[in-house]
Curated annotation (Swiss-Prot):
Species annotation: Methanothermobacter thermautotrophicus (strain ATCC 29096 / DSM 1053 / JCM 10044 / NBRC 100330 / Delta H)
GO biological process, one term: FMN biosynthetic process
Protein name (Swiss-Prot/TrEMBL): Riboflavin kinase
The protein's required cofactors: Mg(2+)
Function: Catalyzes the CTP-dependent phosphorylation of riboflavin (vitamin B2) to form flavin mononucleotide (FMN).
Length: 122
């Protein structure tokens, strides 16, 4: 995992997304994302394909999402903003808690994700 641009908190708190996060993800995300580097960008694309959509609006882009479990402990979701500055091999994970504090994570730490494929369309 690595530090991001600090933009996640801004977008997570926008009302255009917040109500949909509560409805579709089942939680109110902590303002910020955990950026997870994935060695193979093709893995990211495979996860992203068929992911459900959270609608943007008012100049904000749509966001695809897939529910996941981080380190076997924290339920959350991987977000795929259609407008992003991240390179392809980076996943943005959100959860209802501050993940760095809750799991005592630092830049460079390795994390695991269990992907919930039940909402992914083929």
């Amino acid at each position: 995992m690595k530090s991001g641009f600090g933009e996640g908190a801004y977008f997570i708190t926008r009302s255009v997304y917040r109500d949909q996060f509560r409805e579709k993800l089942g939680f109110d995300p902590f303002p910020g994302t955990l950026n997870i580097e994935v060695g193979d960008p093709e893995i990211v694309e495979r996860i992203r394909e068929g992911a459900p959509v959270i609608q943007g609006g008012g100049g904000f882009g749509d966001v695809l999402y897939v529910k996941a479990l981080l380190n076997g402990v924290v339920e959350g979701a991987i977000l795929f903003p259609l407008k992003t500055h991240h390179r392809q091999g980076c996943l943005e994970f959100v959860a209802p808690v501050n993940l760095r504090k809750t799991l005592k994570l630092r830049d460079g730490d390795t994390v695991s994700l269990d992907i919930d494929t039940s909402e992914i369309q083929e």
